[in-house]
Amino acid sequence: VGPTIFSWNDETKLKIGKFCSLAEEIVFILGGEHRADWITTYPFNALFDEGAHITGHPSSKGDIVVGNDVWIGYQSCILSGVTIGNGAIIGARSIVTKDVPPYAIVAGNPAKFVRYRFPQETIDKLENLAWWDWDISVIKEAIPLLLSDKIDEFFTSPEKEST
């Protein structure tokens, strides 16, 4: 079972980067946010002609943008307006309501910051290197290092020099 996408707004988009790992039963909610600042949260305007002229409900906080090399765990839910940075990890069954920085690990309901995967200097290097944009032949050559913890070796590898 792949991701489920609920969309209440044709203008709100889901953008997913390259080489992402998406577990089963993820839910992306594009819009459909109930207005907590209105007297009722019920969508009368969507169901009754008397409210058809009233806009703004349900609402959207914007596009969902998932960066490159992101892992989203089983049964997670991502709300509209969220950007998930490159290399981030979303723990299983997390409810993501806010942006997630690159290479951060978040988990829970609502999702909270757990830790960064790497020191900031390494994150900056990975962001600048953007290996996910390399030609696929170069990525294939780099697989032994991509699937390792040899970070320093990865940054000095011949594959890096050919990009």
Model-derived regions, located:
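C-terminal segments of enzyme domains that contribute to small-molecule binding surfaces
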Residues: F44-I78, P110-T163
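Acidic, glycine-centered active-site loop in nucleotide-sugar glycosyltransferases
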Residues: P102, A107-P110
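Conserved catalytic-core motifs of eukaryotic protein kinase domains, centered on the activation segment
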Residues: G32-E33, V100, Y116-R117
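Flexible, glycine/small-residue-enriched loop-and-beta-strand segment within the central core
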Residues: V1-S80
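Conserved acidic donor-binding loop of glycosyltransferase catalytic domains
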Residues: G91, T97-K98, V114
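Extended beta-solenoid/beta-helix repeat architectures
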Residues: T83-I84, V100
